[in-house]
Amino acid sequence: MMPVSADKIFGWLSACLSIFIFIVSIKVSISSFRVKGKYKTIPFYMRIENILNYFVCSSWLIYSYIFNNIHLFSCSLIGTIFFFLWIIFIYLIYFRKISCFKYLTFIILALIYIPFILFLFGFSWSIGGPICVTFNIISFFPSILMLKEVIITKNYRLIKIKLNLLKLLAHLCWFIYGFIIININIVIPNVIGFIITFVSASFWNIFKKKSGSEKLSNRSVEVMRNRTEYTI
């Protein structure tokens, strides 16, 4: 029996984690877009998150196809299909409600046009890698906007901690995989993603503790007040 190499272990582990993250991300997006059957105002960073994810997956899909990387190709293919269907169907319903057909038309054209151009001109090692890295780094923009809102509002519930921890683990696995196969294009975005995700998890922990201590303090004050009233 042939021993399984480390790059295959971390490659498939990273791919499986990424696919699971795609599913959880879409589930979170659906719950955010719909509350008891009614549409609500969606923050800008949540509107563009899955669009950026689509561009990331489609660019990595072409890159992995050209360079014959089965681990990247499998998760990128599933991610591209998931986010494409999400944008076409869910955004179609949402933008119909707010009458933004021009915006929707732009999104649909971008979904078809950008991957076509990337495939038409083809990838080379010097061009394809930086394009994927650029899309990947841009996709962290919604996370930074969300983190900014968390810091301003001190509302730790904006951070989905389970999804955050999954992303943290996935970034770590992809980093190790990229390090093993010596691919800087995989290493760079996952180092940046790991840092942003770790900072988000840290703020979630900090603000949750502060919220818990404030609730405990308010409860103590209320108990003391009730005791004083009872004594009087």
Over which residues does each language-model region extend?
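Alpha-helical membrane-protein topology signature
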Residues: M1-I232
